[in-house]
Amino acid sequence: MTTVIKNGTVYQNGHLIKADVLIDGQKIKAIGTDLEGEEIIDASGMIVSPGLVDVHVHYRDPGQTYKEDIKTGSQAAARGGFTTVGAMPNVTPVPNTAELMDKMVRENQKKGLVHILQYGPVTNDETTDIIPDYAALKKAGAFALSNDGHGVQSAQTMYLAMQKAKENNLIIAAHAQDDSLFNKGIVNEGIAAEKLDLPPVTELAETTQIARDLLLAQKTGVHYHICHVSTKTSVELVRLAKARGIKVTCEVAPHHILLTDSDIPEDNAYFKMNPPLRSKEDQVALLVGLLDGTIDLIATDHAPHAKAEKQGGMRGAAFGITGSETAFSTLYTRFVKEEKVFTLEQLLSLLTDKPATVFGIENAGLLAPGENADIAIFDIEHQREIKEDDFKSKGVNTPFTGHKVYGETVMTFVDGKVVYQRGTK
């Protein structure tokens, strides 16, 4: 069966063009004008984009499915316009053997509505210094390595891990955190910590480990990717490392450029995430880093939790917020429509072709004849209010509830199949 998406504005190769998109089965057959198909979808006034790519999600499956599972996580991704995601390995059990990795890959394929790429762990259970068999993990389907949620505390362990990752052509995506400096902190050292009388998190917990790892990456030649950079100094370190030819890339999460620690209104656990919300100076540096290419891409760090884990203030609450269903609309509304920090083309690139390129993900992040029909259609004129009742995710832990935004997902295709349509349950 053929389907033609007509009259939309298509994001292709860095440009927005008026065109139709013809889908034949699982593939894009043509992009052009006056195309015909058996089924017609009118996208007048809408943006037709490659499916968004999110290299940083937490699906909690197996082991913590009361928070999220593969089905609900991928439903949330589809509602947000994401068609390819990278799932972190902080599940129970951690997929640290070929057998466990193979099982996870098969479960992702079986239950997921979108393409789910599975991370393997840097160390066996993300906290030990035991390095698993990377070759076996890669053969079983691991697309990259991460201990996200934990920094690798031992420099020697990270050095050995980088050497082995380099041998196996695997990216290490690091959660940069020195636990001795993090010191059980909750919010950024500064305005929020003082106002709320909460334990502070110094930026040094992030920056010192980035500095260490950049030296190790320079020595080993590994592709070192930094998850959710959040400070001005982190951006400066990456900028310097890139200038020196170190193979480093990094991402920023939407909340770190949309919010600062001064936006935390009270002791509200929906504002508790790791890294924490930083200062206005840090926020500006992150935006500059995105604009000049120091920061390569945007990734959500979608981290759903049960409501009970986000009640009673920050001290006893879990770290993390959801992001799949709010990312595009909040970013578009603030930085394209209102403040004009980015063009729409720049924002779409940071969410499509750039993450696909950084991680070498084939058949993702672009619209072209012969490519997979992974497509998102966005209504950038319709305003909606972010409401908990609308979420597909089990987690509703977001500080953006009640915000009025533009850029709603109208329809999402994966391999030519509609996996989300606005107005359907």
Curated annotation (Swiss-Prot):
GO molecular function, one term: dihydroorotase activity
Family statement: Belongs to the metallo-dependent hydrolases superfamily. DHOase family. Class I DHOase subfamily.
InterPro entries: Amidohydro-rel, DHOase, DHOase/Allantoinase_Hydrolase, Dihydroorotase_CS, Metal-dep_hydrolase_composite, Metal_Hydrolase
Classification via HAMAP family: PyrC_classI_B (MF_00220_B)
Enzyme Commission number: 3.5.2.3
Co-factor binding details: Binds 2 Zn(2+) ions per subunit.
Positions bound to Zn(2+) 1: H56, H58, D148, D301
Keyword Metal-binding recorded: yes
An annotated GO cellular component: cytoplasm
Gene for this chain: pyrC
Role summary: Catalyzes the reversible cyclization of carbamoyl aspartate to dihydroorotate.
Biological process per Gene Ontology, one example term: purine nucleobase catabolic process
Protein name as annotated: Dihydroorotase
Highest rank taxon of the organism: Bacteria
Record NCBIfam families: PRK09357.1-2 (NF006837), pyrC_multi (TIGR00857)
Enzyme class: hydrolase
Disulfide bonds: none
Known pathway: Pyrimidine metabolism; UMP biosynthesis via de novo pathway; (S)-dihydroorotate from bicarbonate: step 3/3
